């Protein structure tokens, strides 16, 4: 392979929030040794200072990459979210700068599904309330309000990777599984898709939420929806904190319309483990509250570390953007010559202008890869030419109207 445009030991990776050591091991094994690692999140000023000369940043859910922070990152090439969600990153601002954002949407699927199963079993048996009372010295041995999971109906809202895993695990306990999704999905096992959310809420003994955070899911479980739930049923939310209207949930618990709940995510969460946590749900003994630990298992964090680090390495090594959330997706083979990358506004004439540059210089294009999204185009061009010719072509590419970013990869 031709010499890379920037030596790997000069490419800086900024990793915050204690991403798993497997990520560091993967980066070092690939030749990336210039790594700045922080166990916790950085405040805005520290973040801006550290990211200023970083080429890559890896973060989890507490660090917020706003447009202001992204614009302070003068050399930033890509962002890796070592978690499922990417709502902590201004995706549009990153796209405008030609910066792809990668995440690990499936690596903690099993961990979240197992947590929900555990919460479901505890709630059905009334363990949270019995445990709280026992801690206060109250012995309350009763069968009333305590149930087996077998034969109960589980309603899953959002039948994606976590929802399907949950359904499989619940069926193994003898539960009847129903799900609601905005798209028609192929059921796994004996699960049944329900066409209307209200029907799912009416029939389910336990309702578990597994939806993304977007305008359509904000407070999707409000007073109206909770009132449609079966009296004495249970609500579990291990998806996003904005999905459940917390005051409405408190009202349903206080009136005993719901027998209990398990909440792992909240509308606002402490920035660090040393910050206090407050919620009106704290007053209810029959509610399980956990600090956003759905994906916090050693296995999940290791898988996430390997997956996201691998995506950053591939993008740095050969320009592949497969599974980027804000960027045209291209999976690329290695090439022995020179590789140039051009990120541009999706408008007519750009590809023609690019090809004209090489035609005028008498340079043959060995391979060309193009992928577009609604707003952006991403072209990777492999050529057989010396470094001076490639550098001259790069400068001409940068001058094309509509160019967001262009660089010589190697």
From Swiss-Prot:
<keyword id="KW-0560">Oxidoreductase</keyword>
<dbReference type="InterPro" id="IPR050223">
    <property type="entry name" value="D-isomer_2-hydroxyacid_DH"/>
</dbReference>
<dbReference type="InterPro" id="IPR006139">
    <property type="entry name" value="D-isomer_2_OHA_DH_cat_dom"/>
</dbReference>
<feature type="binding site">
    <location>
        <position position="181"/>
    </location>
    <ligand>
        <name>NAD(+)</name>
    </ligand>
</feature>
<dbReference type="Pfam" id="PF22629">
    <property type="entry name" value="ACT_AHAS_ss"/>
</dbReference>
<dbReference type="GO" id="GO:0005829">
    <property type="term" value="C:cytosol"/>
</dbReference>
<keyword id="KW-0718">Serine biosynthesis</keyword>
<keyword id="KW-0520">NAD</keyword>
<dbReference type="Pfam" id="PF02826">
    <property type="entry name" value="2-Hacid_dh_C"/>
</dbReference>
<feature type="binding site">
    <location>
        <position position="264"/>
    </location>
    <ligand>
        <name>NAD(+)</name>
    </ligand>
</feature>
<dbReference type="InterPro" id="IPR036291">
    <property type="entry name" value="NAD(P)-bd_dom_sf"/>
</dbReference>
<feature type="active site" description="Proton donor">
    <location>
        <position position="292"/>
    </location>
</feature>
<feature type="binding site">
    <location>
        <begin position="292"/>
        <end position="295"/>
    </location>
    <ligand>
        <name>NAD(+)</name>
    </ligand>
</feature>
<dbReference type="GO" id="GO:0004617">
    <property type="term" value="F:phosphoglycerate dehydrogenase activity"/>
</dbReference>
<dbReference type="GO" id="GO:0042802">
    <property type="term" value="F:identical protein binding"/>
</dbReference>
<dbReference type="InterPro" id="IPR006140">
    <property type="entry name" value="D-isomer_DH_NAD-bd"/>
</dbReference>
<dbReference type="GO" id="GO:0070404">
    <property type="term" value="F:NADH binding"/>
</dbReference>
<feature type="active site">
    <location>
        <position position="240"/>
    </location>
</feature>
<keyword id="KW-0028">Amino-acid biosynthesis</keyword>
<dbReference type="GO" id="GO:0070905">
    <property type="term" value="F:serine binding"/>
</dbReference>
<comment type="function">
    <text>Catalyzes the reversible oxidation of 3-phospho-D-glycerate to 3-phosphonooxypyruvate, the first step of the phosphorylated L-serine biosynthesis pathway. Also catalyzes the reversible oxidation of 2-hydroxyglutarate to 2-oxoglutarate.</text>
</comment>
<comment type="subunit">
    <text>Homotetramer.</text>
</comment>
<feature type="active site">
    <location>
        <position position="269"/>
    </location>
</feature>
<feature type="domain" description="ACT">
    <location>
        <begin position="339"/>
        <end position="410"/>
    </location>
</feature>
<feature type="binding site">
    <location>
        <begin position="161"/>
        <end position="162"/>
    </location>
    <ligand>
        <name>NAD(+)</name>
    </ligand>
</feature>
<dbReference type="InterPro" id="IPR002912">
    <property type="entry name" value="ACT_dom"/>
</dbReference>
<dbReference type="GO" id="GO:0047545">
    <property type="term" value="F:2-hydroxyglutarate dehydrogenase activity"/>
</dbReference>
<comment type="pathway">
    <text>Amino-acid biosynthesis; L-serine biosynthesis; L-serine from 3-phospho-D-glycerate: step 1/3.</text>
</comment>
<dbReference type="InterPro" id="IPR054480">
    <property type="entry name" value="AHAS_small-like_ACT"/>
</dbReference>
<dbReference type="GO" id="GO:0006564">
    <property type="term" value="P:L-serine biosynthetic process"/>
</dbReference>
<dbReference type="InterPro" id="IPR045865">
    <property type="entry name" value="ACT-like_dom_sf"/>
</dbReference>
<dbReference type="InterPro" id="IPR029752">
    <property type="entry name" value="D-isomer_DH_CS1"/>
</dbReference>
<comment type="similarity">
    <text>Belongs to the D-isomer specific 2-hydroxyacid dehydrogenase family.</text>
</comment>
<protein>
    <recommendedName>
        <fullName>D-3-phosphoglycerate dehydrogenase</fullName>
        <ecNumber>1.1.1.95</ecNumber>
        <ecNumber>1.1.1.399</ecNumber>
    </recommendedName>
</protein>
<dbReference type="GO" id="GO:0070403">
    <property type="term" value="F:NAD+ binding"/>
</dbReference>
<feature type="binding site">
    <location>
        <begin position="238"/>
        <end position="240"/>
    </location>
    <ligand>
        <name>NAD(+)</name>
    </ligand>
</feature>
<dbReference type="InterPro" id="IPR029753">
    <property type="entry name" value="D-isomer_DH_CS"/>
</dbReference>
<dbReference type="Pfam" id="PF00389">
    <property type="entry name" value="2-Hacid_dh"/>
</dbReference>
């Amino acid at each position: 392979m031709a010499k890379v445009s920037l030596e790997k030991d000069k490419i800086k990776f900024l990793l915050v929030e204690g991403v798993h050591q497997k990520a560091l091991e993967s980066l070092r094994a690939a030749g990336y040794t210039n790594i700045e690692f922080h166990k916790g999140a950085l405040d805005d000023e520290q973040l801006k200072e550290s990211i200023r000369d970083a080429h890559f940043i890896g973060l989890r859910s507490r660090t917020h990459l706003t447009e202001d922070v992204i614009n302070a990152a003068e050399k930033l090439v890509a962002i890796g979210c070592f978690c499922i969600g990417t709502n902590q990153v201004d995706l549009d601002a990153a796209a405008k700068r030609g910066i792809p954002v990668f995440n690990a949407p499936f690596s903690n699927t099993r961990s979240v599904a197992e947590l929900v199963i555990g919460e479901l079993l505890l709630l059905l048996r009334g363990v949270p309330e019995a445990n709280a009372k026992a801690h206060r010295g109250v012995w309350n041995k009763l069968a009333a309000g305590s149930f087996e999971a077998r034969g109960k109906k589980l309603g899953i809202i959002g039948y994606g990777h976590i929802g399907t895993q949950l359904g499989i695990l619940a069926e193994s306990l003898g539960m009847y599984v129903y799900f609601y999704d905005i798209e028609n999905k192929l059921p796994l096992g004996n699960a049944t898709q329900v066409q209307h959310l209200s029907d799912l809420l009416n029939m389910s003994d336990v309702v578990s939420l597994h939806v993304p955070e977007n305008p359509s899911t904000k407070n999707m479980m409000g007073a109206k929806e909770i009132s449609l739930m079966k009296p004495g049923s249970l609500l579990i939310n291990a998806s996003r904190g904005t999905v459940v209207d917390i005051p409405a949930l408190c009202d349903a618990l206080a009136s005993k319309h719901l027998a209990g709940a398990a909440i792992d995510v909240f509308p606002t969460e402490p920035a660090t483990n040393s910050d206090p946590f407050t919620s009106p749900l704290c007053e209810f003994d029959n509610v399980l509250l956990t600090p956003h630990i759905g994906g916090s298992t050693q296995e999940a964090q290791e898988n996430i570390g390997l997956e996201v680090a691998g995506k950053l390495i591939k993008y740095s090594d050969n320009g592949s953007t497969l599974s980027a959330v804000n960027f045209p997706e291209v999976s690329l083979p290695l090439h022995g010559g020179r590789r140039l990358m051009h990120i541009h506004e999706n408008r007519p004439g750009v590809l023609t202008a690019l090809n004209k540059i090489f035609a005028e210089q008498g340079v043959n294009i060995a391979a060309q890869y193009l992928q577009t999204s609604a707003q952006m185009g991403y072209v990777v061009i492999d050529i057989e030419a010396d470094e001076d010719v490639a550098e001259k072509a790069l400068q001409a590419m940068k001058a094309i109207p509509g160019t967001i970013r262009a660089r010589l990869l190697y």
